[in-house]
């Protein structure tokens, strides 16, 4: 960077417009992780991610290719959360407390003793299916304030990354 650019939490960008795009994709990646857990089960665990201004890439442990209907269910679930315009909140807590609370975390992550836990939802609206947080994850941020800021989420590719590891590439529009 040579002293130029923006750094917010886990993301870096060359300007504010780029940071806004990456922030939308970053929060969408959290929703993708949570949706994969809900659709495929808790054997899913993150192995890595990469966010550019064009797309997010998410690598996770899973032992087979996803079926087209599973990909659609994941994508639909993420978009349902986006349309619900859920509030994204953050709280600081000791790492062990965060893990016990059920917050997702990157197994290779090197975390400080006190971490930020970002939660998406619950919804305050009556009749909402989101009475509990949809996503709860240890992260440095930054994130959108409401999921409605993300835009439409679309999975563009699902493939093998390595033995037992799948990769999803997705965009927001």
Task: Pin down the residues of each PLM region.
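A glycine- and charged-residue-rich anion-binding loop/surface
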Residues: 1-173
């Amino acid at each position: 960077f040579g002293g130029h650019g923006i750094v917010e939490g886990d993301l870096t960008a060359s300007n504010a417009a780029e940071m806004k795009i990456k922030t939308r994709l970053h929060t969408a990646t959290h929703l993708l992780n949570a949706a994969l857990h809900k659709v495929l089960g808790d054997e899913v665990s993150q192995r890595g991610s990469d966010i550019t201004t064009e797309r997010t890439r998410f690598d996770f442990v899973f032992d087979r290719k996803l079926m087209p209907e599973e990909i659609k269910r994941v994508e639909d679930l993420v978009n349902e959360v986006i349309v619900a315009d859920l509030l994204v909140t953050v709280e600081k807590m000791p790492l062990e407390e965060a893990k016990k609370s059920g917050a997702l975390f990157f197994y290779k992550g090197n975390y400080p003793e006190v971490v930020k836990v970002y939660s998406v939802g619950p919804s305050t609206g009556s009749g909402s299916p989101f009475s509990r947080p949809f996503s709860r994850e240890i992260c440095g941020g930054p994130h959108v304030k409401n999921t409605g800021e993300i835009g439409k989420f679309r999975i563009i590719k699902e493939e093998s990354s390595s033995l037992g590891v799948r990769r999803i590439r997705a965009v927001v529009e």
